[in-house]
C-alpha cells in the first residue's frame, strides 16, 4: 500500500515536459550554413570555375558509351571437338603378307587395311612371331620392349615387335620356346602355345597403354583372349569398356582339351569352368562364343548352316542358344593385290574391257606346263587344299568321264597323302591332258588363275572361300556347289549370274554343270559376256568393311 501511495503522489507532483525550442529564423540558418561551407572550402583544393553555359540547338541523342572496363569482348571461335578415333585390335594366329596358311591370314591383312583407310579408326593387329615369317618384312620389325606374362603358376618371357603397313600397326609376340618352330600349327602343345599368346595380348595392352574399343578375335587360337577378358581382365578399370567380337572361320577346328589343364595350364579358375566346358572337355570356341558380345562367321549362308548338326561339328546347340548375337559377313579380297591389270606374276596383263592378255596367259601357261598349246581347248583348274571337305571325292568319281572331252585339267595344292597320290597318278595316266602340282606357290597360283578358263570348287562345306573370288577377278569362270560363301558369291549362269552352281553334293550333278560350262565356253560371245560379269563383280573388302563398321558401332552404342 505504501508503495502505491508514493507512486501516485509522484505522478501528481511530476512537471509537464518542456516544449521544444522554436527554430531559428530562416535567415539565421542560411547564415550559419554559409559559414560552415566557407570553412570547408578553406581546407579543400580550389574549385574550377563553372563552365559558361550557352544556349544551343537541341542536341542529337547522346550515344551512351560503356566504361572501358566493361567493353564487350570478342567471342572466341567455337572449339572444334575432334572425335577420338575408335580403336580396333585384331587378334589372330596369322596375317598376310607376313605368314599365311589359309584364308584367315587374307582376312586379317585385307580387312584391317580396308578399315584403316577410314580416318575414324585406329586399327592394329597382333600375331605370334613365327620362325617362318617372311624375311623381307622381319628385317624391318622394331623391338619395342618385353614383359613377363603370367601363365598359371609361371611367368614367361614375351618380346614385343612392331611394324606398320598400310596404316595398320602390327605387333608380333616373341617367345622362341613357343614360336621358333617350322610352320604355325600341328604341335602337341598348341593349346599352351596359344594360351601364352592370348595372355600376352592382354598384358601387352597395359604395356602399350592401348585399350581398344573393339577386341576382334579370330578362330580358336585367339579364343582365349575373349575368355581372359571376361574372366580375369574385366575387373580392371582400364579393360572394362573393351567389347569382344569373335569370328568363326571354320567351325570344324574348335580347340578342344582336357578339363584337367584349365587352371594349371590356361590359368583360369575352375569357377569359370561352365563357360568353356562342352561335352566333358574344354572347348575354346564354345568359351569365346559365350564370352563375346557378338560373334560372326565369314558368310551369311554359313551363319545359318552352323545352326545345323550337319555343318556344326557338334556345336549347334551352343550356336542356336547364342544366335541372338550371331551374324554372317562375307569376306572379300584385296583388289590391289589381285588385279590382272597390274599383277607382275602374270605373263600378260589385261582387264574386263580388254581381255586379249588373258589369251596370252593361257598360251604361256600351256607351254610352261608342257600341255598342248590349243586356244580352243578349255582349261579347268583347281587350286585347293587336298582334304575331304573340298569335294575331292566328287572329282575322283567323275573326272575321267569329263576327260573324254577335249579339255585340260590343272591342279595345284597339298594335303592328305591319299589325294596327293591319286592326282599324281591321274597326271601320269593322262599326260598331255592333266597336270598335278603337289605344292603351293603364290606366283604360280596367279598364273593358273589367269591362264585357266574354268575354276572348279565343289566343296562339301565352305565357310567363305576366296579362290572363287580370285578366279572371277581374273576372268576364270567358277563352278561351285551352293554352300557357305560359295553360294553368297557365285550366282548361277541360268539366272543371269557370274558362274555355274549345283545344289546337291552329288558327283553327277557336278558333271552336268561342267558339261554346261564347256558348252557355253564354245559360244565365244556368250562366254565373253560371262567373263565380263565375273570380272566386274564387287568382291572388294570395301563393301564387307562397311558391314563390320556397322557391327562395331552397334556394339559401342550399348
Feature map (PLM): residue ranges:
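Catalytic cores of nucleotide-sugar-dependent glycosyltransferases that transfer UDP/GDP/TDP-activated
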Residues: 2-15, 19, 23, 61-558
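N-terminal intrinsically disordered, low-complexity tails
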Residues: 9-68
Amino acid at each position: 500500500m505504501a508503495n502505491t501511495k508514493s507512486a501516485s503522489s509522484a505522478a501528481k507532483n511530476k512537471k509537464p515536459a518542456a516544449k521544444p525550442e522554436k527554430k531559428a529564423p530562416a535567415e539565421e540558418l542560411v547564415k550559419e550554413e554559409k559559414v560552415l561551407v566557407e570553412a570547408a572550402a578553406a581546407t579543400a583544393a580550389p574549385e574550377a570555375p563553372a563552365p559558361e553555359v550557352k544556349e544551343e540547338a537541341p542536341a542529337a541523342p547522346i550515344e551512351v558509351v560503356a566504361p572501358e572496363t566493361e567493353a564487350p569482348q570478342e567471342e572466341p571461335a567455337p572449339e572444334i571437338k575432334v572425335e577420338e578415333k575408335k580403336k580396333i585390335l585384331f587378334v589372330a594366329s596369322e596375317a598376310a603378307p607376313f605368314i599365311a596358311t589359309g584364308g584367315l591370314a587374307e582376312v586379317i591383312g585385307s580387312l584391317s587395311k580396308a578399315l584403316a583407310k577410314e580416318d575414324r579408326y585406329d586399327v592394329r593387329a597382333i600375331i605370334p612371331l613365327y620362325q617362318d615369317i617372311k624375311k623381307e618384312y622381319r628385317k624391318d620389325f622394331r623391338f619395342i620392349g618385353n614383359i613377363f606374362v603370367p601363365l598359371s603358376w609361371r611367368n614367361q618371357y614375351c618380346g614385343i615387335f612392331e611394324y606398320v603397313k598400310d596404316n595398320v600397326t602390327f605387333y608380333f609376340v616373341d617367345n622362341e620356346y613357343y614360336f621358333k618352330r617350322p610352320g604355325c600349327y600341328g604341335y602337341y602343345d598348341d593349346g599352351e602355345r596359344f594360351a601364352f599368346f592370348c595372355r600376352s595380348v592382354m598384358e601387352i595392352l597395359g604395356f602399350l597403354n592401348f585399350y581398344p574399343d573393339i577386341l576382334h578375335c579370330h578362330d580358336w587360337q585367339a579364343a582365349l583372349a575373349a575368355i581372359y577378358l571376361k574372366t580375369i581382365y574385366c575387373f580392371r578399370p582400364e579393360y572394362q569398356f573393351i567389347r569382344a567380337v569373335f569370328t568363326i572361320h571354320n567351325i570344324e577346328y574348335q580347340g578342344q582339351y582336357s578339363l584337367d589343364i584349365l587352371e594349371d595350364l590356361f590359368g583360369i579358375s575352375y569357377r569359370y569352368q561352365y563357360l568353356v566346358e562342352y561335352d566333358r572337355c574344354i572347348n575354346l570356341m564354345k568359351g569365346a562364343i559365350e564370352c563375346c558380345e557378338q560373334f560372326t562367321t565369314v558368310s551369311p549362308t554359313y551363319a545359318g548352316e552352323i545352326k545345323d548338326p550337319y555343318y556344326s561339328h557338334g556345336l549347334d546347340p551352343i550356336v542356336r542358344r547364342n544366335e541372338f548375337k550371331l551374324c554372317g559377313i562375307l569376306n572379300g579380297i584385296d583388289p590391289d593385290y589381285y588385279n590382272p591389270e597390274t599383277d607382275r606374276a602374270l605373263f600378260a596383263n589385261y582387264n574386263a574391257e580388254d581381255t586379249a592378255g588373258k589369251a596370252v596367259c593361257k598360251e604361256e601357261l600351256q607351254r610352261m606346263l608342257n600341255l598342248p598349246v590349243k586356244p580352243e581347248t578349255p582349261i579347268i583348274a583347281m587350286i585347293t587344299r587336298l582334304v575331304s571337305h573340298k569335294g575331292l571325292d566328287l572329282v575322283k568319281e567323275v573326272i575321267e568321264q569329263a576327260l573324254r572331252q577335249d579339255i585340260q585339267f590343272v591342279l595345284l595344292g597339298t594335303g592328305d597323302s591319299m589325294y596327293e597320290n591319286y592326282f599324281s597318278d591321274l597326271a601320269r595316266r593322262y599326260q598331255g591332258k592333266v597336270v598335278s602340282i603337289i605344292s603351293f606357290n603364290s606366283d604360280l597360283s596367279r598364273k593358273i588363275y589367269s591362264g585357266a578358263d574354268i575354276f572348279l570348287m565343289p566343296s562339301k562345306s565352305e565357310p567363305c572361300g576366296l579362290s572363287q573370288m580370285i578366279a572371277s577377278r581374273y576372268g576364270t569362270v567358277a563352278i561351285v556347289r551352293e554352300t557357305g560363301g560359295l553360294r553368297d558369291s557365285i550366282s548361277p549362269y541360268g539366272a543371269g549370274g557370274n558362274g555355274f552352281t549345283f545344289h546337291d553334293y552329288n558327283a553327277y550333278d557336278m558333271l552336268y554343270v561342267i558339261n554346261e560350262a564347256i558348252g557355253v565356253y564354245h559360244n565365244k560371245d556368250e562366254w565373253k559376256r560371262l567373263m565380263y560379269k565375273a570380272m566386274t563383280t564387287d568382291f572388294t573388302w570395301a563393301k564387307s568393311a562397311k558391314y563390320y563398321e556397322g557391327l562395331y558401332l552397334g556394339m559401342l552404342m550399348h
